[in-house]
Amino acid sequence: MKIRPLHDRVIVKRKEAESKSAGGIVLTGSAAGKSTRGTVTAVGNGRILDNGSIKPLDVKVGETVIFNEGYGAKIEKIDNEELLILTESDILAIVEE
């Protein structure tokens, strides 16, 4: 199944959380928490402005992003993969490696 986000929505596949603490302790289960990083798998056409024009999104497919866990993230299971549906404003940064 293919999913296509609308407007300023972005589909993100969450990356695995770090399994070691800063001190080198191996974390398991809920102690590891959920990552707030992911890879963009699809983007909408853009945000509709007040004048009716469309502003393209700044994020692109394939980019790694850091997102805000608590703001508007919707979790869906598509083909046994957990995907997040976020608005572009839920994304805090693009990771450049």
Swiss-Prot record:
Transmembrane intervals: none
Keyword Chloroplast (UniProt): no
One GO BP: chaperone cofactor-dependent protein refolding
Keywords: Chaperone, Cytoplasm
Localisation per UniProt entry: Cytoplasm
GO CC annotation: cytoplasm
A Pfam family: Cpn10
PROSITE patterns linked: CHAPERONINS_CPN10
GO molecular function: ATP binding; metal ion binding; protein folding chaperone; protein-folding chaperone binding; unfolded protein binding
Gene3D superfamilies, alphabetized: GroES chaperonin
NCBIfam families: PRK00364.1-1, PRK00364.1-2, PRK00364.2-2
Record text on subunit structure and interactions: Heptamer of 7 subunits arranged in a ring. Interacts with the chaperonin GroEL.
Family: Belongs to the GroES chaperonin family.
Purpose: Together with the chaperonin GroEL, plays an essential role in assisting protein folding. The GroEL-GroES system forms a nano-cage that allows encapsulation of the non-native substrate proteins and provides a physical environment optimized to promote and accelerate protein folding. GroES binds to the apical surface of the GroEL ring, thereby capping the opening of the GroEL channel.
Name of the protein described by the UniProt record: Co-chaperonin GroES
Encoding gene, per UniProt annotation: groES
